Amino acid sequence: MSVLITGSVAYDTIFSHEGEFARQLSGDLRNLNTTFLASSMRRDFDGCAANIALAMKRLGGDPVIWGALGMDGEDYLARFRSFGISTEGLQCFPDVYTAQCVIFTDSLGSQLAVFHPGAMNRSREVPWPRREGKDLRPKLAILSPGGKTTTLNAANECVSRGIPYLFDVGQELNLFSAEELESLLSRSFGIAYSDFEAEGFEAKTGLSSEAIGRTGKLVLRTHGSRGASLFLPGAGGAVPVEPLPVAAQNPVGAGDAMRGGFLYGLARGLDPVASARIGAIVAARKVASPSAQDYPLTLDGVRKDYEGMWGAAGF
């Protein structure tokens, strides 16, 4: 069964500076005019929707991204096709660039970043995905971070089509009013967020993870290296999801990997706990790799990890 994924599809350009930014940024910064020498540069494929889709696909799922690319989007389309990921929900706009993030780091790990949403702001213009001449009917959807308008539009479409969706709060919490957050939550089957995002959500809406669970919604709350917790409808408390022990290299993209594994399990008809455990394994495999997308992952490998942690896998 297919899973609809909305959110960002982006390119990252990462520069490294061998010195320290602070040495060139001292003094009056109101008239800043300086240049940093980059000793290395690389370009990565990134974006929440893309990361989630690739994690799902490697496990054998059927992700369908609904979103926008720009005039430079052909490389991303080719990448999706190379993995067998459907591109029927993607459209390239010739007058804008694909969403881009330019990141500059120094020897101390300090970071300067610029994000340009580009084509992401045109996502609302992309028609609903079609397959074999008919509107796609996914089993479920996830609304991952991709801009306020994109998220609100996707929620309306999913509700009107009777498609249950998971609200993935992400780092766009401050884009929404309390009323908008409550509306997005009330129409979803559940919410996914990190500890930091959960605290921000509660501060804006007054709704804790426990309170949301008591309303009948599923809550997936991630704790970084400490794993995750599930708050299930009708349950008395949180169900812990232990992390798989790995040597961490780069945590960037781990949350997306977690969601990809979680959605794969739900789409397969597994219960939320088993699905979250799959997500935890996928997240661990991502953390053990320097890349947000290019990390070793197979369903057989996930099954072995699952059995080693929790016993019979059942998938």
Predicted regions mapped to residue ranges:
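Gly/Ala-rich phosphate-binding loop of Rossmann-like dinucleotide-binding domains
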Residues: 57, 159, 267
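Conserved phosphate-binding/catalytic loop of the ribokinase/pfkB sugar-kinase fold
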Residues: 88-93, 101-145
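Active-site metal-binding loops of divalent metal-dependent hydrolases
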Residues: 9, 146, 257
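Glycine-rich phosphate/adenosyl-contacting loop at the front of the ribokinase-like
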Residues: 1-64, 75, 247-248, 315
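Hydrophobic anchor at the start of a short beta-strand
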Residues: 3, 62-63, 87, 165, ...
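A glycine-rich beta-to-alpha transition motif near the start of alpha/beta enzyme domains, typified by
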Residues: 62-89
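Conserved phosphate-binding/catalytic region of the ribokinase-like
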Residues: 205-315
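Conserved phosphate/ATP/ADP-binding segment of small-molecule kinases
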Residues: 159-240, 247
